[in-house]
């Protein structure tokens, strides 16, 4: 893999200098980098890249950072004994705050 990267850089350097100077060289070097990076990461299907949509990434970050309003508990995936213990503690806390627990 490293050999193919070095070989690609070398051919870009020689081909770029022979056909049009530094600007052509830089254009050749950097125009294919995203495609090569995606293919080396296994993100291509032969017809283009998969999952490289920046809007989807931004939406994922926004959804992951949403925080529920104060006083509203998020849905829990716990079950069984853990859920029962959580409910008991939550109910005891509410009763304590409401002042319905007698000492």
Swiss-Prot record:
GO terms for cellular component: viral capsid. The keyword rRNA-binding does not apply. GO terms for biological process: symbiont entry into host cell. Keywords: Capsid protein, Viral genome ejection through host cell envelope, Viral penetration into host cytoplasm, Virion, Virus entry into host cell. It is found in: Virion. The keyword Protein biosynthesis does not apply. InterPro entries: Microvir_H. The virion is composed of 60 copies each of the F, G, and J proteins, and 12 copies of the H protein. There are 12 spikes which are each composed of 5 G and one H proteins. Minor spike component of the viral shell. Involved in the ejection of the phage DNA in the host and is injected with the DNA in the periplasmic space of the host. Involved in the determination of the phage host-range. This is Minor spike protein. It comes from Escherichia phage St-1. The lineage of its organism: Viruses, Monodnaviria, Sangervirae, Phixviricota, Malgrandaviricetes.
